[in-house]
């Protein structure tokens, strides 16, 4: 949820943010009206409760002659208080709905526009020049790494098996990511992948993108599409001590996405699938530290990409392509030779205080135990995921159909070269 102080002091800033996202700026006026109505309802209810309390005291001290009139007034006030409390509850509900409808306020400098309006911040390496390159699925099948056919037989479209050295390649990649995270002060975590509705909603994934989320109806639980979700809920309703700096966690989990809005897109291979594995960095910090921490997350992502030795670019994602929780997002996109374009491998988002406000995650300024709790900031960033296999296989392929294993992954895979294998049963 957005900061009400900003809304009240500078509503035009929130309107501009909505417009840059391509979202409805009139929602800002609806929230302002709901905020005013809520405060008025609270004031009315408080006034009536105070009058009711005073009237109750008067009844006790009244003479027999005065008591009937005072009792009648007390009864009338009780009915008015009940009605006022009902009106307050309705106003609170309307306010909460209006508050939840507004996306995070975009940070100044984020490009306006939609998916194609990003700004390129950096390009690293030259696009790999290959004559008649094979795509990652052809390579994965010929090398005995990926089995889409049996994945579809067992689970349906957009499922797969990683087999043999394909499994080792992914496990090595994720272990490398976790190792880098630990070296930089992250606490490794293996979180639950089923979460309660309030946690999923708190991270902002039950709004416009609710159809992308798997729900276990019998238990009223959701399968997570990223370990960002359970890690954001980890400190819900807590007051943190950030006096020693940010709290950093690295979650390793399977992730699940319905891809309901992606019909017909990336149907070949493991670019867009229903289940994948990922190491996700998640950070709690003070709002003042958030932008610097965002740059640090991007730096660690770039370090991981350097280790897998692929050309990539960094983009500043346009406001209209941001999720509702993100105030700014950087993507690192690797070159995919068979598509002759860059595809997203990592994203890192600065969610400012948006998620923490929903989840009631606070900190005490300066670590002062008596200080007033403040809303924390949260950030997240991919450190390694299944999709990276696409970039590794395609960029390191050789004319004979083999694939060179990036040096950093050789100890995990057990070989420097992946070579075609014969068909198996």
From Swiss-Prot:
**Where in or outside the cell is it found?**
Cytoplasm
> What is the enzyme's main class?
ligase
Q: Which residues form a coiled coil?
A: none
Q: Where does L-serine bind?
A: 226-228, 280, 382
- Report the EC code(s) recorded for this entry: 6.1.1.11
Pathway(s) served: Aminoacyl-tRNA biosynthesis; selenocysteinyl-tRNA(Sec) biosynthesis; L-seryl-tRNA(Sec) from L-serine and tRNA(Sec): step 1/1
Q: Which reaction does it catalyse?
A: tRNA(Ser) + L-serine + ATP = L-seryl-tRNA(Ser) + AMP + diphosphate + H(+); tRNA(Sec) + L-serine + ATP = L-seryl-tRNA(Sec) + AMP + diphosphate + H(+)
Write one Gene Ontology MF term.
Answer: ATP binding
Enumerate the Gene Ontology biological process terms: selenocysteine biosynthetic process; seryl-tRNA aminoacylation
Q: Which Pfam families match?
A: Seryl_tRNA_N, tRNA-synt_2b
Keyword Ligase assigned: yes
Which residues hold ATP?
Answer: 257-259, 273, 344-347
Asked if the keyword Cytoplasm belongs to this entry, the reply reads: yes
Q: What is known of its domains?
A: Consists of two distinct domains, a catalytic core and a N-terminal extension that is involved in tRNA binding.
Primary role: Catalyzes the attachment of serine to tRNA(Ser). Is also able to aminoacylate tRNA(Sec) with serine, to form the misacylated tRNA L-seryl-tRNA(Sec), which will be further converted into selenocysteinyl-tRNA(Sec).
Under PANTHER family, the record lists: SERYL-TRNA SYNTHETASE
Q: How does it assemble?
A: Homodimer. The tRNA molecule binds across the dimer.
Official protein name in the record: Serine--tRNA ligase
